[in-house]
A protein has these predicted regions:
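Bacterial N-terminal signal peptides that target proteins for export
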Residues: 1-6
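N-terminal signal peptide c-region/cleavage motif recognized by signal peptidases
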Residues: 13-16
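Short, glycine-/small- and polar/acidic-enriched structural segments
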Residues: 20-157, 166-169, 173-179, 202, ...
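Sec/Tat-exported extracytoplasmic proteins
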Residues: 48, 74, 79, 89-92, ...
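Soluble non-cytosolic domains of exported or imported proteins
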Residues: 61-64, 129-137, 161, 176, ...
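Pocket-lining segment of extracytoplasmic ligand-binding domains
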Residues: 155, 162-258
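Secondary-structure end/capping motifs
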Residues: 218-306
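Conserved C-terminal helix/tail region of periplasmic/extracytoplasmic solute-binding proteins
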Residues: 293-345
Length: 345
């Protein structure tokens, strides 16, 4: 009897140890709402159990704060853009991997002017945005398109959580932000969209970033997250009731209705299948895009004090490495998305 009790206790203990806990954080954005839905519908739990682990999915209202928490080790993975992955965790020395390339912004990020309709009218104005984020990058690309420089405007750092309310102030005349905030701002009187991310396709990617060391030690985490993601994608991308219900839930969670959420999806190049994501990840465009992003980051001092040039941090992809091969801190790894494409998860 004692042996049986000991055996059962050992089995229970081994089961408990096997269910290692991991934490993933996300913030509100059209391309990341599926994580909240997947957690609520227990899809993430299902895939975690399949691989003998536990995954807690946590929503954080402040986007930059979510990345900062990931960078200091509070979370194992976090949703963020390609630029922010480079300039926050990677630049801070945290070796990070793009586990999932979920989409690229195709109009979901934009520059809005109040009472003006041309980018050139922005000269001399204050521009509210999340400083040093992709909104700042978008502003730089917009200014570049009409021969202006950042010195022609004044950037006002504004949290995404406060953006809509602050834009309502009379003295605020320009803002760069992302959806759903962008659509809320555009609904206000005299607001004009003068530049958006559809004019720089593929340059603002939305990713699930994971700590590289954690992923290497726990491939089950990578498999569970990728498996859950593409199950959610298959549900929401259809035209049946299940798809409508899924997108309706995401719409409500992001503060809009189904029509509003579908409008945001229309300006997002969602990669609903792993094959679609792999097409970008395996392309020559990936590293050429990251070169532009790294150059912007270096010009703004975002790669750290030790960075002598834009190539200070190595960025690896299936086609090679941009930057310092001895200091790779951001990796685009197609391994797990390929497993999903091959139906081997």
């Amino acid at each position: 009897m004692l042996r049986l009790t000991t055996l059962l206790a050992a089995l229970f203990l081994s089961s408990a140890v096997a269910a290692q806990p991991f934490k993933v954080c996300w913030s509100i954005y059209v391309g990341w709402m599926p994580w909240g839905y997947g957690a609520e519908q227990k899809i993430v739990d299902k895939w975690a159990k399949k691989y003998g682990i536990e995954i807690e999915v946590v929503q954080i209202n402040d986007y930059i704060e979510s990345i900062n928490q990931y960078a200091v080790g509070q979370f194992d993975a976090c949703t963020m853009t390609n630029m922010d992955a480079l300039t926050i965790p990677a630049a801070g020395g945290v070796d990070s991997t793009a586990l999932i390339v979920g989409d690229f912004s195709n109009g979901n990020d934009g520059l809005v002017l109040k009472g003006k309709s041309s980018i050139k009218d922005i000269k001399g104005q204050k521009v509210n945005l999340v400083e040093l984020s992709v909104s700042h990058y978008l502003l730089a690309r917009a200014l570049e398109s009409v021969g202006l420089k950042e010195s022609d405007v004044k950037v006002v750092n504004t949290s995404d959580a406060d953006m809509v309310a602050i834009y309502g102030n009379r003295d605020v005349t320009a803002a760069t932000t992302w959806n759903p905030l962008l659509n809320e701002i555009l609904s206000q009187p005299s607001s004009n969209l003068v530049f958006d991310s559809s004019q720089i396709p593929g340059e603002i990617m939305d990713l699930l970033i994971i700590n590289t060391e954690t992923l290497n030690k726990n491939p089950a985490l990578g498999k569970a997250l990728v498996g859950a993601w593409y199950e959610i994608m298959s549900i929401m991308s259809g035209s049946d009731k299940a798809a409508t219900d899924a997108r309706s839930a995401m719409a409500t969670a992001s503060g809009t209705d189904l029509a509003g959420y579908d409008a945001q999806l229309a300006s997002t190049r969602m990669f609903f299948t792993p094959d679609a994501a792999l097409e970008l990840v395996n392309s020559d465009d990936l590293l050429s895009t990251m070169k532009k992003v790294a150059e912007f980051a270096h010009q703004h001092g975002l790669l750290g004090d030790a960075a002598a040039d834009a190539e200070f941090i190595g960025i690896s992809g299936p086609k090679g490495v941009y930057g310092n091969q001895k200091n790779i801190k951001l990796r685009f790894d197609a391994t797990y998305m390929q497993l999903a494409a091959d139906k081997k998860l």
